[in-house]
Every structure is written in C-alpha cells, then in structure tokens.
Amino acid sequence: MRVSAGAFSDPRSLASIETLLCASPELVRLRFAHACCLEDLGRTHEAIAAYADVIEREAGHIGALTNLGCLLLERECADAAEPYLRAAVAAHPDDPVARVNLARLEAALGDLAAAIDAYDAVLAIRPDHVHAHLGLAALHERRGAPELARRHRTLAYARPRAWRYPYYGDMPPVRVLLLASASGGDVVSNLFFDERSVELSIVLADSVRRLDDVAAPDVVFNAIGDADRSAASLERARAICAGLGVPAINDPAAVARTGRVAIMHRLAGVAGVRVPRTERIARIDLRASTLAARGFTFPLLLRAPGHHAGMHFALVTTAGELAAVAATLPRDDLFAIEFVDVRDAAGDVRKYRVVAVDGRLYPVHLAIAREWKVHYFSAGMAESAAHRAEEARFIAEPAAVLGPAGMRALEAIVAALGLDYVGIDFAVDAAGRIVVFEANATMAVYHPPGEAMWAYRRPPIDAVIGAVRAMVAARASAVGSSA
C-alpha cells in the first residue's frame, strides 16, 4: 500500500509540479508530489531517486518511506526495502498503512509469524482494515488454517469497499465504474482516466452484495485482469456487470478465460503462433518423473500463479535442481512452463510488447537482453544506442519488423481472446513464429523517462492512452444515444 499526494494521470501534472518546485524548491510536500507523479507515470527509477531526496530532507516522511519501500518490495528487493518500511513504522507506530507494509515485508522475508503479528497490530488500530484481513486470510491459507482464512475474508468484505474520485471538468462527466480485486493482478489504469472528463468510482468487486452498493455508471471498466489469481473476483464482477446493464470494457467472463493454461489451449491452433506448454501442478506432485510423464524436459520454468513482473519465476536447468528451486517459490501449486530458447546467434533475447485496444494493435516496447527473463526495466536499454534504435524501428513500423505473417498471428490472438484491452508479450523464433510469453488484460503501459533518448517511446504510449480514453467515451456515448 502506498501513500499518494494525488492521482496523476497526465505528464502535464508533472510539468506543473516542476514549475512550482523551481519557485519553491524547499517545499517537501512539493517534492513528495513530484515523486508520486513520477511513480504514477511509470518513471520508476526517477521516482526512487525523488523519494530518497524527500527522505534526506525529512527522515521520518511517512509517504516517502512507504512508497520507496513498496517500490523496492514489488521488485523482489525485500532486503533493500526493509530499512524504509521498518523506519516508517518506527516513526509512525499508529499508522495502519505502515504496519500493513511491514506485514508484507515480513512475509516476503519468510517470517509468516511476524507477518501475522504485524497484520494483527493493524486490526488493533483499525478493526475493519480490508488489506489486513485479506493479508491474514492469505497467510492462514498458507499455514493450513482454512477456517481462519475464511473468517478474515468475510470480515474484509463485511461492507462495500468503494472510492469516488473528484471531477474537475466543466461539462457533464463520463461516469466510469472501475471494478478491482483486492487480491491484486489488476491492470494499471491510472493513465486511462482524465479527471477533467471522467468521474471515476472504484469498487472492490468482492465487497459488493447489492447493486445499490455502487454508483450508477455510464460504463464499467473491468480492471480485474488475472484469471489465475482473481477467479472469485471475476465471477462477482460478471454478476455486477450483468445487473447494471451498461457497457462493460473487458467483460469479466472473457477475462476469466485467460488463465495461463487456458491461453495455451485456446491459441494452440492459431497459425504462426507457438505457446509454450504450460501446466498447473500441485507442489506435492512436482517431481521430475511427473514432469516427464506430462511431456516436459529440462530446462524448464516454474512460476507461482498470480505473480507478474518476473516475481516468483525461476529457471530449472536440471532435474537435480527441481526441489531446491521449487522451495524458493510460494503457493501450494506452481506452473510448469516449457522453456523455449529464443536467443539469436549473438545470444540476445528480444521480448516485444503490443497492446490491442478495441481490436487495434499498438506497439509498446521492445526489450533486448542476454538473460532468459527479460523485463524492460532491467534490460539495460539505456546503455545501448543500437538496441534503442532497433526498438524505435519496431515502434515506428511493427509490420516491417514482424512481417505480414507475424502481424496476422497477433491479430488472430487478439480475435481469439475477445478482450477490449489486452496485451501480448512475445518473441519471434527462428521459424518466424510468434512465441507467446503472456497474453492477458494485466499488461501495463507507462510513460518513458524524461530524457531525450526516450522521445521515440512517447508517441506510442500516448496513442494507447488516447485509444483507451476514446473507447471509454464511445461506449458511454452509445448508452446516451440509445436511451
């Protein structure tokens, strides 16, 4: 959980804050807002530096300590996050957000008992804290106490959990109801809604018992994107959408069919596409003989369901490593995933990302690295002008890079999934096939850093954001014209 200075969805907000900072560089609250805005816009490395600057000026700043710790924790850097999150609790012992994040830290460090104690401390301060109850539910499930887990989940959703954001426009707004899941795995959507044209309400779908619990919208945006992590939330979202009877972007029923194993089966017959074999296997059955019987060979990949950004995702090179690697991953079941070697002759791996909005494809980025697990933020693109030039070519002319067959394959994937907003992470193998790493509704887009070297990445991100905003407005207008 982070502390926010506001909801920043537009680079113009950053420019305004920076103008104010030039006039009043000593104001810590402005420096904190600057850091939050950088984070909201996806400029993570700059945000980390900006939060550190706030802490240097005000050592006990709850927002900077919390947000910097959370950024590091989300990147599996628990050791680096630890001093900040512990300092937040030390400086603000009665702050429930600080203690929730301490519980998350303890769990990441492997001390489940300490994590439970930290969540209990939150409930001593605020007995109805939804994230504390849900955190305890997850921990008690891991410890084999399903009744306790069920009790805390019931308490978490004892009342509707909804938030309405302020509207700053002059004309009647488009009223958007965003459905979210407390279990995580939602699409990062803050850039998609401009508070000058959209009145945004957010509700945790699991907490809704009656339609009267939510504000009447013009359109629903279902942000619940992880079918493996949030199946119950998607089912509740489906019922909400059916009851409201307004257009729903990313129909929950369609999202529910995008789990990793389901995607493998659904895309198996698509021409020009290769989807690595994927099976969900109970930890107790995770043996080399079981994997061999199911058609797996080494090396292979293990992944904990419901995690993204490379978290809890590991390469197993030999059967002898299987038990040790599996022991480092959470969950009682894991995905076993076929390892497809997509390195080129020089040893580089290319991971492309495209997003489809209302059926139209948009290039987002290309990350090039030597590691098998490629992520843009760790690929070292800033250090290679040649790699950035290659990415710029892909962004400018994806069809020229991927070829007609590659574009047809991507279009077929989008058509097969039937989502209004969907992302695809993929490589291209030696045969020219699209090798799908992920295809789902959780794909995020972020503005690039402010340096001139990244200027080529800004237009495609703006195009995606503009397309989503236009889609939302069009769906809302369709309701108004038919009324």
Regions from the PLM with identified roles:
Residues 277, 298-325:
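Glycine-rich phosphate-binding loop of ATP-grasp-fold ATP-dependent ligases
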Residues 314-409, 413:
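Phosphate-binding site of ATP-dependent enzymes
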Residues 415-419, 428-483:
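C-terminal active-site "lid" helix and adjoining low-complexity regulatory extension at the edge
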Residues 165-172, 177-290:
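Conserved N-proximal alpha/beta basic substrate-recognition cap immediately N-terminal to
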